[in-house]
Amino acid sequence: MDRINTSAAPPTSPDWERLRADFPLLQRHVHGKPLIYFDNANTAQKPQAVITATDTFYRRHNANISRAVHTLGTEATEAYEATRAALATLLNVPMHELVLCSGTTFAINLIAYSWALPRLRTGDVILVSRMEHHANIVPWQLIAERTGARIQVADILPNGTLDLDALHTLMTPQVKLLAITHVSNVLGTVNPIHDICRQARQRGITTVVDGSQAAPHRHINIPAIGCDFYAITGHKLYGPTGTGALWARREHLHIMPPFLGGGEMIKEVSFDGTLFNTPPHKFEAGTPNIAGFIGLSAAVDYVRRIGIDQIETRETELLAHLTEELQKIDGMRLFGTAPNKAAVVSFMIEGTHAHDLATLLDLEGVAVRSGQHCAHPLLQYYGVTATCRASLAFYNTHEEIERFITALLKVRKLLG
């Protein structure tokens, strides 16, 4: 069989400049200047291996999965399931406990409507942290409205770390669910997720972990974390948009009803009733983003060949350099100075607005994000309506950081 190759990947010993060349978009110019892409927490750029894998699928293997015995259908199905296997290896979980979906937002809503909605009652508590992305707040608000449950918020300390004493105090018998991010998309704070999940499990609290910002940058060993649910997003992991995965404990998957109905999630259908498929397939109704998941498989292979520990070390070095240079700027305010951080820095300069900074930086070829970063309650805590956020990936360089600082100083001068 003409197999889909998703493993055209870099050398085992990282040569960061060579790896950077694997990303076609990083070669472009913006407003006549070399692009500096510092918006990786928003989405990561895609290596050529990912682009080639999706292109090859459409050129040579395009067919639906699990619905045909012909050669193309078999090839597509095998390649799609190979993605599940690659993700399972990355996260150290069994394949049959991994639901493929469109991303973390879908995954959390799946948990909300299939696990929480049938179980929560008036008086129950859903515990979330101040630093959550809206995708890990709004679904729980919707469930609370429908069930009579209450939402309580675990607050943070000024340096952007969770107030762990307060969190543990809030873990009362009324708390049935704890929804928490592994890594903050605004602050970069890496939460002590192993300890938090252990404390919750001792109290009989079900845990949902948003791993969107963690999976691309850190080694994830889900059994060691000890959570009940863990969700990731493919497009932040150098894969295509519209891809992601939800891991759930086997006992949860078997008792949860399907979230959506349609093809593939059934075994038998009659007008008298339907027999659903077994997990994880009963949660995968309809035709998925097949090409996207094949691209995600290539992305996972690419990351594993570099080594996630190598990536973390590289990004930690870049973060230290960026933070040091930002702290030298008069009027600079950094949000989130936790001792354990991913390569995300949110900042403001006194007397300027985040959108003005980002707009003028774009004219210098620099891409950063400005706004509230889908985390309104967190910015309210800091008393601001918007920040700029620079977020790094392994393919960024120290030279880019120097150019970014030069551009930032120029913009600051223009804004007076």
Swiss-Prot record:
N6-(pyridoxal phosphate)lysine PTM positions read K236
* Enzyme Commission code: 2.8.1.7
Gene3D superfamilies in UniProt: Aspartate Aminotransferase, domain 1 (3.90.1150.10), Type I PLP-dependent aspartate aminotransferase-like (Major domain) (3.40.640.10)
Q: Which GO terms describe its biological process?
A: cysteine metabolic process
Q: Which UniProt keywords apply?
A: Pyridoxal phosphate, Transferase
Top-level taxon: Bacteria
Under the heading SUPFAM superfamilies, the entry gives: PLP-dependent transferases
Record's catalysed reaction(s): (sulfur carrier)-H + L-cysteine = (sulfur carrier)-SH + L-alanine
Does this entry carry the keyword Signal?
Answer: no
Q: Which cofactor does it need?
A: pyridoxal 5'-phosphate
Pfam assignment, any one: Aminotran_5
InterPro entries in the cross-refs: Aminotrans_V_dom, Aminotrans_V_PyrdxlP_BS, Cys_dSase_SufS, Cysteine_dSase, PyrdxlP-dep_Trfase, PyrdxlP-dep_Trfase_major, PyrdxlP-dep_Trfase_small
Q: What does this protein do?
A: Catalyzes the removal of elemental sulfur and selenium atoms from L-cysteine, L-cystine, L-selenocysteine, and L-selenocystine to produce L-alanine.
Q: What is the protein name for this chain?
A: Probable cysteine desulfurase
What is the originating organism of this protein?
A: Xylella fastidiosa (strain Temecula1 / ATCC 700964)
The gene that this protein is the product of is csd
